[in-house]
């Protein structure tokens, strides 16, 4: 085998190895991202039944933010939560999809109209966000 051919072969093999290593590291990063989001989701569940209205409101805002991040992750984009929710209609059953939109609208009322949230509303919203975020991250 000639020297130039040997050098070319070695370079091609090294490039292939680098490509494979980068793909492996990327998939590990994806697993870590999912794990972080699911851990955050679990942690937020501790606050949904709080007697403190501000904690419940903050939790709903954070849950919606987590929904947005999970949709960005799924669609590999940086679009708004609302834009990505429109794309997500095929992921969920019709009633679940509507409930998710209702939870998102509740979050908007909290942010834009300073709306209070009852414990029941907070718990129901958490249940919907949890169900949907887990499904998105599968």
Regions found by a protein language model. Give the residues of each.
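Amphipathic alpha-helical interface elements
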Residues: 2-91, 95-98, 128, 135-138
